[in-house]
Structure formats: C-alpha cells, structure tokens
Amino acid sequence: MKVFVTGATGAVGRPTILLLVAAGHEVTAVARTDEKRAQVEAAGARGVLVDLFDPGAVAAAVAGHDAVVNLATNIPPITRAARRSAWATNDRLRREASAHLVDAAMAAGAGRLVQESVVFYPDSGDRWIDASSTAPAPTPVVASALEAEAQAARFTDGGRVGVVLRFGMFYGPGLSHTETFLRLARWGLAYSAGERSRYTSSIQVGDAAAAVVAALGAPAGIYDIVDDEPLASDAYADALAAAVGRKRHLR
C-alpha cells in the first residue's frame, strides 16, 4: 500500500515509519526541514517537504497514494503548556491541515485515512468508559481534536474508511515530557495529574505506532488506544517514583 504520513518525525511518527516500511508499505513521509527529511529517508521512507496549510501543495503531495495517516501535531513543552497561545499551531493543524488532507485524499481516490486524536473523557472515577459509552469533554487546548475527528468522519461519509485513534498520554524513551517526569521523580517531586483520585490512561509510543499500522486494516470508527491499566494520579506518581528508586517527598 502507498501510504502518505504526516508528523513522521514526531513521537509516534518515528516508530510508525519503521513499522510501515517493515510491513512492506511504500511510505511517503512529510518533514519540515532537510535534516528531518534525511531522518525519514534513513528509516526507509521517501521524504517530502510540504506546507500542510497550503491546500494545493497538500493535494499534489497526496496524489497517487492509497492511504493517508495524519499524525501531525505541535504540542508545546510542559513549561509552556499552560499558555493557551502556545497551542495555536496545534489547533491550526487539527482544524486546517486535517481538512486539507481529507480533501486531498478524496481527490486522489485514497480509500483509507487514519487521524490521530486524544482521549478526552470526563472524570468518571473508577468506572470503565470508552468511545462507545461516554461523550468527550475536551478542555480548550484539545477541543480542536474534535474538528480533526469530524474531518475523518467526512471522509467516511464519502464512502471511504476513516479511522480515528484516540491516544492516551504518550510515554517512552526520548520523549521530553517523559524525561521531565522522571527528572522530577528523581528529585522526589513525582508528577501527578490533578486530583489524586483522577485516572490517567497512557500508551507507550511503540504500541501507539503498532496501532497506527493496524488501523490500515480496521473498520471505520473511533478507537481508544491506551494501556490496559489506567492509574489514579496518586498511583501514577508513585509508579514514577518507584521507577527511579526514590520516595516521594510531596503528596
């Protein structure tokens, strides 16, 4: 299958490219710089420089592909994440770029589109929830993900297969926020996401990449991509502390 991938040098994009190439797919990967293009080409993909906000450029790049995988995001670092303005480019990618990619995929006759999204369900305590039972309740910084999901639904409504992957919080080697959490844990200040009883669902980036590849053969719809054990924030912080062999000084 000829697969067009955006966000190819991101947290999930890097392992996804490797898995797609290993599975025998012919991969075109979008990069933002010549250096990034060299990285994806070293992984076995064909690298291209494309402005995702330029619909004409996107259409030209997508032509001739069987599937589009949209993993493009611009998530700010933890030190800036509290600023709403820091999410502006990410919002544009989800609102504008996702629409351009769907338009281009439909014009190209591609039969399948995979759209990255995020789990954003309301706090439901220890009750098990998923996309089929619980409506999303996104915070302002992730609300634009719903617009990207709507574009995937538009693709499906056009007689094709649109798959949305709602990922949990990524973790893995080399990810900036993972390194930040571990550094805090070494100082005895383990990360805690909100109230101590609030649950967090996570996903290792390698598993997330495997889900992207599997989505190329999945029915249309929304899928939650998370580990099988969500953790309450307090337990999450304890797990981080244990991982670095430290006790938490603050609770």
Residue ranges and their predicted role:
Residues 182-190, 197-230:
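Alpha-helical substrate-binding/gating segment
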Residues 136-141, 168-175, 195-203:
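Glycine-rich "substrate-gating" loop/helix at the edge of Rossmann-like oxidoreductase active sites
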Residues 32-96, 100:
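NAD(P)H-binding glycine-rich loop region in Rossmannoid oxidoreductase-like domains
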